[in-house]
Amino acid sequence: MKQVFPNDWQEILADELEKTYYHTLRQFIANEYSTQTIYPPMQDVMNAFYTTAYQDVKVIILGQDPYHGPNQAHGLSFSVKPGIPHPPSLRNMLQELQDDLGCPIPQDGTLTKWAEQGVMLLNTVLTVRAGQANSHKDQGWEQFTDAVIDKLAAREEPLIFVLWGKPAQRKKQLICKHATPHVILEAPHPSPLSAYRGFFGSKPYSKINQQLVEWDKRPIDWCLA
């Protein structure tokens, strides 16, 4: 079987990579990249897995589909490439980070530092056509990322799942069917449409760190600037 991941995700997802739907999805994606402008760049699609190995995951922040503007998406949910203006949801996340932990708002909205510490930044759909939000919905990505969530929730070691907004919160059933007492943090989505309905003031970053300390795990250094 082709090596998709350079770490333990390869073994964890080996069965999934052999399933018919995944081969169909790969063909669809290959065709889209050859005929359309697709984000993120093909080499970045699996970045969430490359950057955070299965065994290293402590926290999962679930997003929806990638940013669909030029040079924004690079395979980590909510994150943008260096030098790119902060999209509104990310701007609100960084504002809450400042309010919660006093972290200065960084110039770059690149969240790789979080991912390298065990915060998996996973979108439920991993590709998108330029300028067309949700254009790769229902092509197979959801089945793949549901399997990822299921594999994470199956771990004996508890994790923290961060579910912002209704689509993310619908994944709760995948998490709760497992016996492991995972912690689920729910809040409205940080988008401008809902941030003032309870995302601001939800203090996710300090709550995550308090929980990690309770579990005798190293807290996340959230500050980016």
Curated annotation (Swiss-Prot):
GO cellular component: cytoplasm
Enzyme class: hydrolase
Molecular function in Gene Ontology: uracil DNA N-glycosylase activity
EC number(s) from the headed UniProt entry: 3.2.2.27
Pfam families, per the entry: UDG (PF03167)
Localization, UniProt: Cytoplasm
UniProt catalytic activity: Hydrolyzes single-stranded DNA or mismatched double-stranded DNA and polynucleotides, releasing free uracil
Keywords for the protein's UniProt record, in alphabetical order: Cytoplasm, DNA damage, DNA repair, Hydrolase
UniProt GO BP: base-excision repair, AP site formation via deaminated base removal
CDD domains the record matches: UDG-F1-like
Primary location class: cytoplasm
Taxonomic superkingdom: Bacteria
InterPro entries: UDG_fam1 (IPR002043), Ura-DNA_Glyclase_AS (IPR018085), Uracil-DNA_glycosylase-like (IPR005122), Uracil-DNA_glycosylase-like_sf (IPR036895)
Function: Excises uracil residues from the DNA which can arise as a result of misincorporation of dUMP residues by DNA polymerase or due to deamination of cytosine.
Family according to the record: Belongs to the uracil-DNA glycosylase (UDG) superfamily. UNG family.
Name the UniProt record assigns to this protein: Uracil-DNA glycosylase
Originating species: Lysinibacillus sphaericus (strain C3-41)
